[in-house]
From Swiss-Prot:
NCBIfam families from the UniProt entry: PRK06076.1-2
Bilayer topology annotation: Multi-pass membrane protein
Protein name: NADH-quinone oxidoreductase subunit H
Protein's GO biological process: aerobic respiration
Entry GO terms, CC: plasma membrane
Superkingdom per UniProt: Bacteria
Native source species: Moorella thermoacetica (strain ATCC 39073 / JCM 9320)
Record keyword Mitochondrion present: no
GO molecular function, a single term: NADH dehydrogenase activity
Length: 348
């Protein structure tokens, strides 16, 4: 039995095991099981990717990186997590207490919800919605609320400035990000992530939509606050931005959400442009993970290669370059589809 068979058989097994129970009980049980799997995936990825990024940055800067705990420093992230668990939970004087407390939880919830529509392999989609891409974009946009709450609730000018930067940056770059995805949707004729992957059986959309992929990558880098667009927490200017006053596990939730979002935007890029789980010989889930980690490596490589840019240059580049290019890509895609229909089907 393959991993795909196990994944797709979970729902059938639970329905048989809970035969006679109300439908909502079965649905709830399946949802809880999928949630546990997604949370385990997020936590394991965060531990591994933090270590990987530190090693990659060390290699690019001719350093060694973590090498003390475990073989080649593999347990360094575990030690950091244990350290954060033991940190004192501090709430600043004058802070808006409940806003300050709730913000880290609110940013982690949408970061988890994004994985509901990610096709991890053939038949391995937790919730294969017919509006999957729209769901992903809608849920991802809510993270700005939590970051703004964190900056406001801390009663710190640097935190508030960082959160305001975040809102300006993420709201601006959501537009070309969405427009870059529209070209793929036009080609696939569906918003369902599994159908978009299936439509790339003959050719990956990165070959048909290279400009859209570049726009998506740049906009996604800004959306997840990765360098060179990490102005939300520019250390030299505003310390840690909206995370300045957070300690312990509250800070860890922000950090965990950052890597969860990095994996999710990489997974969406693989789904939309790189053929998703499709590939020869290897299992579908393994192909998907390989492509996702290649995308993550590219994000990390960009972070440690390019310098941080100014906020005015960041926003100007979005409105004057990315947005017109994304609109032009939609126009060219639409014309190309019509020409293809005319040549192959004989109709306009």
């Amino acid at each position: 039995m393959t991993v795909e068979d196990i994944f797709t058989g979970i729902a059938a097994y639970l329905r048989g095991f809970l035969a006679g129970a109300p439908p909502w009980v079965v649905t709830l049980a399946i949802g809880v099981l999928y949630l546990i799997g997604v949370l385990a995936f997020i936590f394991l990825n965060a531990l591994y990717l933090i270590y990987l990024e530190r090693k990659i940055s060390a290699y690019m800067q001719q350093r060694i990186g973590p090498n003390r705990l475990g073989p080649h420093g593999l347990l360094q992230s575990v030690a950091d997590a244990v350290k954060l668990l033991g940190k004192e939970d501090i709430i600043p004087r004058g802070a808006d207490r409940w806003v300050f407390i709730i913000a880290p939880v609110l940013i982690f919830i949408p970061a988890t919800m994004l994985y509901a529509v990610i096709p991890f392999g053939k038949g391995m989609v937790p919730a294969d919605l017919n509006i999957g891409v729209f769901y992903f974009l809608a849920v991802a946009s809510t993270t700005t609320i939590a970051i703004l709450m964190g900056g406001w609730g801390a009663n710190n000018k640097y935190a508030l400035l960082g959160s305001m930067r975040c809102v300006a940056q993420m709201v601006s770059y959501e537009i070309p990000l969405t427009f870059s995805i529209l070209g793929v949707i036009m080609l696939a004729g569906s918003l369902q992530t599994s159908q978009i992957v299936a439509a790339q059986g003959k050719i990956w959309y990165i070959l048909l939509q290279p400009l859209a992929f570049i726009i998506y990558f740049i906009a996604a880098t800004a959306e997840v606050n990765r360098a060179p667009f990490d102005l939300v927490e520019g250390e030299q200017e505003i310390i840690a931005g909206p995370y300045t006053e957070y300690t312990g596990m509250r800070y860890a939730l922000f950090y965990l959400s950052e890597y969860a979002n990095l994996v999710s935007v990489s997974a969406l890029a693989v789904t939309l442009f790189l053929g998703g789980w499709q590939g020869p010989w290897l299992p579908s889930w393994l192909w998907f993970l390989i492509k996702v980690y290649i995308m993550i490596f590219i994000f990390m490589w960009v972070r440690w290669t390019f310098p941080r840019i100014r906020i005015d240059h960041l926003l100007s580049f979005n409105w004057k370059v990315l947005l017109p290019l994304s609109l032009a890509n939609i126009l060219v895609t639409g014309v190309g589809i019509k020409i293809y229909q005319l040549l192959t089907l004989g109709r306009w």
